[in-house]
Amino acid sequence: MLKREKVLITGATGKIAFPIARALAARNDVWGVARLRKPGDREMLADAGINAVRLDVSTGVFSSLPDDFTYVFHAAVDPGDGDWRRCVRTNAHNSGELLYHCRKAKGFVYCSTGSIYAYQGQRALSEADGPGVPLRANYSFSKAAGEAVCTWIAEHFEIPLTIIRICSTYGPLGGAPADRLEMMLKGNPIRLHPDKPNNYNPIYEDDYVELGIRAMEIAQTPPIVVNWAGSETVSVEDYCAYMGELVGVEPIFEYTPEAHTPLWPDVTTMHEVLGHTRIHWREGFRRMIEARHPELVLSDER
Protein backbone atom coordinates (compact mmCIF):
# COMPACT_ATOMS: atom_id res chain seq x y z
CA MET A 1 0.00 0.00 0.00
CA LEU A 2 1.30 3.45 -0.92
CA LYS A 3 2.09 5.86 1.93
CA ARG A 4 2.78 9.60 1.99
CA GLU A 5 2.45 9.94 -1.78
CA LYS A 6 0.67 12.54 -3.88
CA VAL A 7 -1.79 10.55 -5.99
CA LEU A 8 -4.01 11.64 -8.87
CA ILE A 9 -7.12 9.56 -9.62
CA THR A 10 -9.18 10.47 -12.70
CA GLY A 11 -12.77 9.39 -13.12
CA ALA A 12 -12.76 9.52 -9.34
CA THR A 13 -16.52 9.15 -8.86
CA GLY A 14 -16.66 5.94 -10.90
CA LYS A 15 -17.17 2.42 -9.59
CA ILE A 16 -13.54 1.46 -10.20
CA ALA A 17 -11.66 4.65 -9.38
CA PHE A 18 -13.61 5.76 -6.30
CA PRO A 19 -12.88 2.70 -4.12
CA ILE A 20 -9.19 2.96 -5.06
CA ALA A 21 -9.08 6.66 -4.21
CA ARG A 22 -10.94 6.03 -0.96
CA ALA A 23 -8.51 3.29 0.07
CA LEU A 24 -5.49 5.50 -0.61
CA ALA A 25 -6.83 8.65 1.04
CA ALA A 26 -6.08 7.55 4.62
CA ARG A 27 -2.31 7.57 4.11
CA ASN A 28 -1.77 9.72 1.04
CA ASP A 29 -2.59 13.11 -0.47
CA VAL A 30 -5.22 11.99 -2.99
CA TRP A 31 -6.64 14.26 -5.68
CA GLY A 32 -9.81 13.05 -7.40
CA VAL A 33 -10.58 14.46 -10.84
CA ALA A 34 -14.14 14.18 -12.17
CA ARG A 35 -16.79 16.26 -13.91
CA LEU A 36 -18.76 16.41 -10.63
CA ARG A 37 -22.07 16.74 -12.45
CA LYS A 38 -24.30 14.85 -10.02
CA PRO A 39 -25.52 16.29 -6.73
CA GLY A 40 -23.41 14.90 -3.94
CA ASP A 41 -20.38 13.97 -6.07
CA ARG A 42 -18.10 16.54 -4.45
CA GLU A 43 -19.33 15.65 -0.96
CA MET A 44 -18.79 11.93 -1.60
CA LEU A 45 -15.15 12.56 -2.46
CA ALA A 46 -14.62 15.00 0.40
CA ASP A 47 -16.19 12.61 2.93
CA ALA A 48 -13.68 9.97 1.83
CA GLY A 49 -10.77 12.35 2.39
CA ILE A 50 -10.21 12.99 -1.32
CA ASN A 51 -9.41 16.44 -2.73
CA ALA A 52 -12.15 16.93 -5.33
CA VAL A 53 -11.19 18.67 -8.58
CA ARG A 54 -13.76 19.53 -11.24
CA LEU A 55 -12.16 18.78 -14.61
CA ASP A 56 -13.43 17.31 -17.86
CA VAL A 57 -10.73 15.15 -19.44
CA SER A 58 -12.40 15.59 -22.85
CA THR A 59 -11.06 19.17 -22.95
CA GLY A 60 -7.46 17.96 -22.93
CA VAL A 61 -6.48 20.95 -20.77
CA PHE A 62 -4.58 19.98 -17.63
CA SER A 63 -2.78 23.23 -16.81
CA SER A 64 -4.92 23.68 -13.68
CA LEU A 65 -3.50 20.47 -12.21
CA PRO A 66 -0.19 20.29 -10.35
CA ASP A 67 2.55 18.44 -12.21
CA ASP A 68 4.18 16.84 -9.17
CA PHE A 69 1.96 13.81 -8.61
CA THR A 70 4.02 10.78 -7.66
CA TYR A 71 1.40 8.26 -8.81
CA VAL A 72 -1.52 8.45 -11.25
CA PHE A 73 -4.47 6.12 -11.86
CA HIS A 74 -6.18 7.30 -15.05
CA ALA A 75 -9.69 5.84 -15.25
CA ALA A 76 -11.68 8.73 -16.80
CA VAL A 77 -13.19 7.76 -20.15
CA ASP A 78 -15.49 8.69 -22.98
CA PRO A 79 -17.73 5.58 -23.22
CA GLY A 80 -18.07 6.01 -26.98
CA ASP A 81 -21.81 6.63 -27.12
CA GLY A 82 -21.47 9.74 -29.28
CA ASP A 83 -19.07 10.96 -31.95
CA TRP A 84 -16.23 8.47 -32.53
CA ARG A 85 -13.69 11.24 -33.11
CA ARG A 86 -14.43 12.77 -29.73
CA CYS A 87 -14.08 9.34 -28.17
CA VAL A 88 -10.63 8.81 -29.72
CA ARG A 89 -9.51 12.31 -28.76
CA THR A 90 -10.55 11.84 -25.13
CA ASN A 91 -9.39 8.27 -24.60
CA ALA A 92 -6.23 8.40 -26.70
CA HIS A 93 -4.95 11.92 -27.42
CA ASN A 94 -5.94 13.45 -24.10
CA SER A 95 -4.67 10.46 -22.13
CA GLY A 96 -1.31 11.11 -23.74
CA GLU A 97 -1.54 14.78 -22.78
CA LEU A 98 -2.21 13.80 -19.16
CA LEU A 99 0.64 11.29 -19.14
CA TYR A 100 3.04 13.94 -20.41
CA HIS A 101 1.73 16.48 -17.88
CA CYS A 102 2.41 13.94 -15.10
CA ARG A 103 5.76 12.80 -16.48
CA LYS A 104 7.45 13.24 -13.07
CA ALA A 105 5.35 10.40 -11.64
CA LYS A 106 6.94 7.21 -10.34
CA GLY A 107 4.02 5.22 -11.69
CA PHE A 108 1.12 5.89 -14.08
CA VAL A 109 -1.74 3.47 -14.78
CA TYR A 110 -3.70 3.77 -18.01
CA CYS A 111 -7.03 1.96 -17.82
CA SER A 112 -7.68 0.12 -21.06
CA THR A 113 -10.23 -2.63 -21.68
CA GLY A 114 -10.32 -6.34 -22.38
CA SER A 115 -13.00 -5.62 -24.97
CA ILE A 116 -10.28 -4.69 -27.46
CA TYR A 117 -9.64 -8.39 -28.09
CA ALA A 118 -10.98 -10.25 -31.10
CA TYR A 119 -13.03 -13.23 -29.97
CA GLN A 120 -11.04 -16.46 -30.22
CA GLY A 121 -13.68 -18.99 -29.21
CA GLN A 122 -13.39 -21.23 -26.17
CA ARG A 123 -9.95 -20.21 -24.94
CA ALA A 124 -8.52 -17.58 -22.64
CA LEU A 125 -7.24 -14.36 -24.23
CA SER A 126 -3.65 -13.32 -23.52
CA GLU A 127 -2.06 -9.89 -23.78
CA ALA A 128 -0.52 -10.94 -27.11
CA ASP A 129 -3.88 -11.60 -28.78
CA GLY A 130 -4.96 -9.13 -31.43
CA PRO A 131 -7.80 -6.61 -31.45
CA GLY A 132 -11.21 -7.10 -32.98
CA VAL A 133 -14.40 -5.13 -33.60
CA PRO A 134 -16.79 -5.73 -30.69
CA LEU A 135 -20.28 -4.30 -30.25
CA ARG A 136 -18.92 -1.14 -28.57
CA ALA A 137 -16.45 -0.45 -31.38
CA ASN A 138 -15.91 3.26 -30.62
CA TYR A 139 -14.85 2.61 -27.05
CA SER A 140 -12.67 -0.40 -27.82
CA PHE A 141 -10.69 1.02 -30.71
CA SER A 142 -10.23 4.32 -28.85
CA LYS A 143 -8.65 2.34 -26.02
CA ALA A 144 -6.37 0.48 -28.45
CA ALA A 145 -5.35 3.90 -29.76
CA GLY A 146 -4.84 5.12 -26.19
CA GLU A 147 -2.52 2.22 -25.48
CA ALA A 148 -0.43 3.14 -28.52
CA VAL A 149 -0.29 6.86 -27.69
CA CYS A 150 0.60 6.29 -24.04
CA THR A 151 3.18 3.63 -24.87
CA TRP A 152 4.98 5.97 -27.27
CA ILE A 153 4.99 8.85 -24.79
CA ALA A 154 6.09 6.63 -21.90
CA GLU A 155 8.97 5.18 -23.90
CA HIS A 156 10.03 8.50 -25.43
CA PHE A 157 10.06 10.37 -22.10
CA GLU A 158 10.90 7.36 -19.90
CA ILE A 159 7.73 7.52 -17.79
CA PRO A 160 6.92 4.34 -15.82
CA LEU A 161 3.59 3.05 -17.16
CA THR A 162 1.25 0.12 -16.58
CA ILE A 163 -1.58 -0.54 -19.02
CA ILE A 164 -4.35 -2.59 -17.42
CA ARG A 165 -6.95 -4.23 -19.64
CA ILE A 166 -10.02 -4.23 -17.42
CA CYS A 167 -12.11 -7.34 -17.99
CA SER A 168 -15.02 -7.73 -15.54
CA THR A 169 -15.34 -5.76 -12.30
CA TYR A 170 -18.16 -5.96 -9.77
CA GLY A 171 -19.04 -5.08 -6.21
CA PRO A 172 -21.31 -2.87 -4.11
CA LEU A 173 -21.10 -0.08 -6.71
CA GLY A 174 -22.19 -2.28 -9.60
CA GLY A 175 -20.79 -3.97 -12.67
CA ALA A 176 -22.08 -6.39 -15.30
CA PRO A 177 -22.94 -9.10 -12.73
CA ALA A 178 -25.00 -6.53 -10.81
CA ASP A 179 -26.79 -5.57 -14.02
CA ARG A 180 -27.62 -9.22 -14.65
CA LEU A 181 -28.90 -9.58 -11.10
CA GLU A 182 -31.33 -6.71 -11.71
CA MET A 183 -32.56 -8.39 -14.89
CA MET A 184 -33.16 -11.60 -12.95
CA LEU A 185 -35.10 -9.82 -10.22
CA LYS A 186 -37.30 -8.17 -12.86
CA GLY A 187 -37.86 -11.45 -14.70
CA ASN A 188 -36.10 -10.19 -17.84
CA PRO A 189 -34.04 -12.50 -20.09
CA ILE A 190 -30.25 -12.24 -20.02
CA ARG A 191 -28.79 -12.06 -23.53
CA LEU A 192 -25.75 -14.29 -24.01
CA HIS A 193 -23.58 -15.37 -26.93
CA PRO A 194 -24.49 -18.83 -28.29
CA ASP A 195 -20.89 -20.09 -28.01
CA LYS A 196 -21.46 -21.25 -24.46
CA PRO A 197 -20.35 -21.35 -21.74
CA ASN A 198 -19.88 -17.57 -21.55
CA ASN A 199 -16.69 -17.52 -19.48
CA TYR A 200 -15.38 -14.51 -17.55
CA ASN A 201 -12.98 -13.85 -14.68
CA PRO A 202 -14.93 -11.34 -12.54
CA ILE A 203 -12.90 -9.37 -10.00
CA TYR A 204 -14.49 -8.11 -6.77
CA GLU A 205 -13.99 -4.58 -5.41
CA ASP A 206 -11.59 -5.54 -2.60
CA ASP A 207 -9.32 -7.27 -5.10
CA TYR A 208 -9.42 -4.61 -7.80
CA VAL A 209 -8.53 -1.97 -5.23
CA GLU A 210 -5.49 -4.00 -4.19
CA LEU A 211 -4.40 -4.83 -7.73
CA GLY A 212 -5.09 -1.29 -8.95
CA ILE A 213 -2.71 0.13 -6.36
CA ARG A 214 -0.21 -2.60 -7.15
CA ALA A 215 -0.38 -1.66 -10.84
CA MET A 216 0.84 1.84 -9.97
CA GLU A 217 3.68 0.46 -7.87
CA ILE A 218 5.07 -1.86 -10.55
CA ALA A 219 4.90 0.59 -13.48
CA GLN A 220 8.00 0.58 -15.66
CA THR A 221 9.50 1.55 -19.01
CA PRO A 222 8.87 -0.05 -21.44
CA PRO A 223 5.28 -0.29 -20.19
CA ILE A 224 3.72 -3.40 -18.69
CA VAL A 225 0.49 -4.52 -20.37
CA VAL A 226 -1.64 -6.82 -18.23
CA ASN A 227 -5.13 -8.30 -18.12
CA TRP A 228 -6.91 -7.08 -14.97
CA ALA A 229 -9.41 -9.64 -13.75
CA GLY A 230 -10.20 -12.23 -11.12
CA SER A 231 -8.04 -15.33 -10.71
CA GLU A 232 -11.03 -17.67 -11.10
CA THR A 233 -12.92 -18.40 -14.30
CA VAL A 234 -16.70 -18.74 -14.03
CA SER A 235 -19.39 -18.65 -16.70
CA VAL A 236 -22.28 -16.21 -16.68
CA GLU A 237 -24.54 -19.25 -16.73
CA ASP A 238 -23.01 -20.57 -13.50
CA TYR A 239 -22.84 -17.31 -11.59
CA CYS A 240 -26.39 -16.37 -12.53
CA ALA A 241 -27.55 -19.80 -11.37
CA TYR A 242 -25.76 -19.18 -8.06
CA MET A 243 -27.32 -15.73 -7.66
CA GLY A 244 -30.68 -17.28 -8.50
CA GLU A 245 -30.24 -19.80 -5.70
CA LEU A 246 -29.45 -17.01 -3.25
CA VAL A 247 -32.40 -14.79 -4.16
CA GLY A 248 -34.91 -17.47 -5.14
CA VAL A 249 -35.20 -16.55 -8.82
CA GLU A 250 -34.56 -18.71 -11.89
CA PRO A 251 -32.38 -16.93 -14.50
CA ILE A 252 -33.73 -16.78 -18.05
CA PHE A 253 -31.08 -16.93 -20.80
CA GLU A 254 -31.59 -15.75 -24.36
CA TYR A 255 -28.81 -16.88 -26.69
CA THR A 256 -28.22 -14.66 -29.71
CA PRO A 257 -25.25 -13.83 -31.99
CA GLU A 258 -26.04 -10.17 -31.34
CA ALA A 259 -24.96 -10.48 -27.69
CA HIS A 260 -21.46 -9.57 -26.53
CA THR A 261 -18.93 -12.33 -27.05
CA PRO A 262 -17.53 -13.72 -23.78
CA LEU A 263 -14.40 -12.06 -22.40
CA TRP A 264 -12.29 -14.83 -20.91
CA PRO A 265 -8.83 -13.47 -20.01
CA ASP A 266 -5.59 -15.34 -19.50
CA VAL A 267 -4.37 -14.16 -16.09
CA THR A 268 -0.89 -15.74 -16.18
CA THR A 269 0.88 -12.39 -16.59
CA MET A 270 -1.36 -10.80 -13.96
CA HIS A 271 -0.37 -13.45 -11.43
CA GLU A 272 3.29 -12.82 -12.21
CA VAL A 273 3.28 -9.02 -11.94
CA LEU A 274 0.26 -8.13 -9.77
CA GLY A 275 -0.52 -11.27 -7.80
CA HIS A 276 -3.60 -13.42 -7.24
CA THR A 277 -7.03 -12.22 -6.18
CA ARG A 278 -8.31 -13.25 -2.74
CA ILE A 279 -12.11 -13.15 -2.85
CA HIS A 280 -13.73 -16.35 -4.14
CA TRP A 281 -16.36 -15.49 -6.72
CA ARG A 282 -19.19 -16.98 -4.66
CA GLU A 283 -18.23 -14.87 -1.65
CA GLY A 284 -17.94 -11.79 -3.82
CA PHE A 285 -21.34 -12.29 -5.40
CA ARG A 286 -22.93 -12.80 -1.99
CA ARG A 287 -21.36 -9.57 -0.73
CA MET A 288 -22.53 -7.69 -3.81
CA ILE A 289 -26.12 -8.85 -3.38
CA GLU A 290 -26.12 -8.06 0.36
CA ALA A 291 -24.77 -4.55 -0.31
CA ARG A 292 -27.10 -3.72 -3.19
CA HIS A 293 -30.22 -5.44 -1.87
CA PRO A 294 -30.15 -5.48 1.93
CA GLU A 295 -33.92 -6.05 1.89
CA LEU A 296 -33.49 -9.54 0.42
CA VAL A 297 -33.20 -12.60 2.64
CA LEU A 298 -30.69 -14.88 0.92
CA SER A 299 -31.37 -18.60 0.62
CA ASP A 300 -29.24 -19.91 3.49
CA GLU A 301 -30.51 -17.15 5.79
CA ARG A 302 -34.18 -18.12 5.44
Language model features: what each stretch is:
Residues 211-214, 218-258, 266-267:
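Mid/C-terminal beta-alpha module of Rossmann-like enzyme folds, strongest
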Residues 39, 51-92:
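NAD(P)H-binding glycine-rich loop region in Rossmannoid oxidoreductase-like domains
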